[in-house]
């Protein structure tokens, strides 16, 4: 005989199983990640971030000791991709660094060093290397893509046949040259069924390799993916914060390169701290203005992926975009500067893309337009800077005070003020 309690228990079991099936369906592309990352019994649906963070912290030591907990591959052997692969391997994740060139892979495996991009920094013994894309990608939980923006779409097309449940995290900052697409847009175009995220922040690779305290942001609509990335990369020297504003985090990482070029140019003229502060804050204003127009949360730009990344990139001579700007400020042509740098400076293309979009859609971006004039129209940098300083009156923080982006309102105010001044002088003369 089955009692009422037994029936109730069966009902509860059925209900629980149904909820589990729904949760598993929602997160089917993340199979095994949370279990490998935390070994906790927490469900996947509507996870409590504080509870998961606590569970991850408790299990972090075990995660670091057991290399089978999370299986990762980083595509791209540049400075940042190498730094992230090294960090994951050091944390105990089963990590492979994929590099296209077979000879480079052999050299890295033999020397345990990326001599081209991170010379002098020994990589973790547990880090594996591969030039075979299929072998590197299959049977992994997360694919981190750290290739230049120009190669991002082609890389996704190359791995598409080998996708069988992996999640993708973009480490690439910038926009596609001809389409104005961000990396998340390209992922949705090429692999629409894949669970994905983007990572961005003030992350100079050499400082990370030196174990200097740093932090970044993982943005994804998938809470399990956010927690998995945090578990994989979090360490005593590297904190990973979470966000669900993919657009804002990604735009912060792309747009700040523009103002790093501006800051590098300004440094070439040996400007003072006032000028640097002005470039930094007015650059942030442009970033948030453009971001809101694109659907981002303006508050995101006050975080690590916004002002944090902007500050680091604008104040460090390690920044490729800063160095490009500095060379331009010293009289080099853009072609000569890029050739001397020998690496990709995403900001050069971003300036052109943002200038065109802002012009088309009426977004007020004076610093961007000025840089475009210098780089693509061969205008004198000093003359363009003086023109910027002579621009019309504006309020400081436009999310606090309403803006009229045209100068019509300003012109009317000035005309009224001039008329009033003439009347006052006339009255004084009559007296």
From Swiss-Prot:
Sn-glycerol 3-phosphate binds at residues 173, 201, 256, 309, 319-321. Signal peptide: none annotated. Its main location: cytoplasm. It is found in: Cytoplasm. GO terms for cellular component: cytosol. The active site is at residue 256. GO terms for molecular function: glycerol-3-phosphate dehydrogenase [NAD(P)+] activity; NAD binding. Pathway: Membrane lipid metabolism; glycerophospholipid metabolism. Pfam families: NAD_Gly3P_dh_C (PF07479), NAD_Gly3P_dh_N (PF01210). NADPH binds at residues 79-80, 100, 173, 205, 320, 346. It is an enzyme of class 1 (oxidoreductase). Keywords: Cytoplasm, Lipid biosynthesis, Lipid metabolism, NAD, NADP, Nucleotide-binding, Oxidoreductase, Phospholipid biosynthesis, Phospholipid metabolism. Its EC number is 1.1.1.94. It catalyses: sn-glycerol 3-phosphate + NAD(+) = dihydroxyacetone phosphate + NADH + H(+); sn-glycerol 3-phosphate + NADP(+) = dihydroxyacetone phosphate + NADPH + H(+). GO terms for biological process: carbohydrate metabolic process; glycerol-3-phosphate biosynthetic process; glycerol-3-phosphate catabolic process; glycerophospholipid biosynthetic process. InterPro entries: 6-PGluconate_DH-like_C_sf (IPR008927), 6PGD_dom2 (IPR013328), G3P_DH_NAD-dep (IPR006168), G3P_DH_NAD-dep_C (IPR006109), G3P_DH_NAD-dep_N (IPR011128), NAD(P)-bd_dom_sf (IPR036291). Catalyzes the reduction of the glycolytic intermediate dihydroxyacetone phosphate (DHAP) to sn-glycerol 3-phosphate (G3P), the key precursor for phospholipid synthesis. Belongs to the NAD-dependent glycerol-3-phosphate dehydrogenase family. This is Glycerol-3-phosphate dehydrogenase [NAD(P)+]. It comes from Psychrobacter cryohalolentis (strain ATCC BAA-1226 / DSM 17306 / VKM B-2378 / K5). The lineage of its organism: Bacteria, Pseudomonadati, Pseudomonadota, Gammaproteobacteria, Moraxellales.
């Amino acid at each position: 005989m089955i009692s009422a309690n037994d029936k109730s228990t069966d009902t509860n079991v059925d209900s629980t199983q149904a909820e589990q099936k729904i949760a598993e369906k929602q997160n089917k592309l993340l199979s095994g990640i949370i279990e490998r990352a935390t070994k906790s019994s927490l469900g996947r649906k509507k996870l409590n971030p504080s509870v998961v963070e606590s569970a991850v912290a408790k299990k972090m030591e075990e995660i670091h000791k057991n290399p089978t907990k999370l299986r990762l591959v980083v595509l791209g052997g540049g400075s940042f991709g190498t730094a992230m692969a090294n960090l994951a391997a050091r944390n105990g994740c089963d990590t492979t660094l994929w590099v296209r060139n077979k000879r480079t892979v052999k050299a890295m495996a033999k020397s345990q060093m990326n001599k081209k991009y991170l010379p002098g920094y020994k990589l973790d013994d547990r880090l594996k290397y591969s030039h075979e894309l299929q072998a590197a990608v299959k049977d992994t939980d997360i694919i981190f893509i750290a290739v230049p923006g120009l190669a991002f779409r082609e890389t996704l097309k190359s791995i598409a046949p080998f996708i069988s449940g992996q999640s993708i995290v973009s480490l690439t900052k910038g926009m596609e040259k001809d389409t104005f697409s961000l990396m998340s847009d390209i992922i949705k175009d090429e692999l629409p069924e894949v669970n994905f995220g983007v990572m961005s922040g003030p992350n100079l690779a050499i400082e990370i390799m030196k174990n200097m305290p740093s932090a970044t942001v993982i943005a994804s609509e998938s809470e399990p993916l956010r927690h998995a990335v945090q578990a994989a990369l979090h360490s005593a020297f590297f904190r990973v914060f979470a966000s669900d504003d993919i657009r804002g985090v990604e735009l912060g990482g792309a747009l700040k390169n523009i103002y790093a070029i501006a800051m590098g140019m300004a440094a070439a003229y040996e400007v003072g701290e006032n000028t640097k502060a002005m470039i930094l804050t007015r650059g942030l204003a442009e970033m948030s203005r453009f971001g809101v127009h694109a659907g981002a949360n303006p508050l995101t730009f006050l975080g690590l992926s916004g002002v944090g990344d902007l500050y680091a990139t604008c104040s460090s001579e390690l920044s490729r975009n800063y160095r490009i700007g500095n060379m331009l400020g010293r009289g080099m042509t853009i072609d000569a500067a890029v050739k001397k740098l020998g690496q990709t400076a995403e900001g050069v293309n971003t300036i052109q893309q943002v200038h065109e979009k802002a012009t088309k859609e009426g977004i007020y971006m004076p610093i961007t337009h000025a840089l475009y004039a210098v780089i693509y129209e061969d205008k004198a940098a000093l003359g363009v800077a003086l023109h910027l300083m002579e621009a019309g009156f504006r309020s400081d923080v436009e999310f606090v005070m309403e803006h009229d982006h045209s100068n019509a309102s300003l012109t009317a105010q000035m005309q009224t003020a001039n008329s009033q001044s003439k009347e006052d002088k006339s009255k004084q003369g009559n007296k």
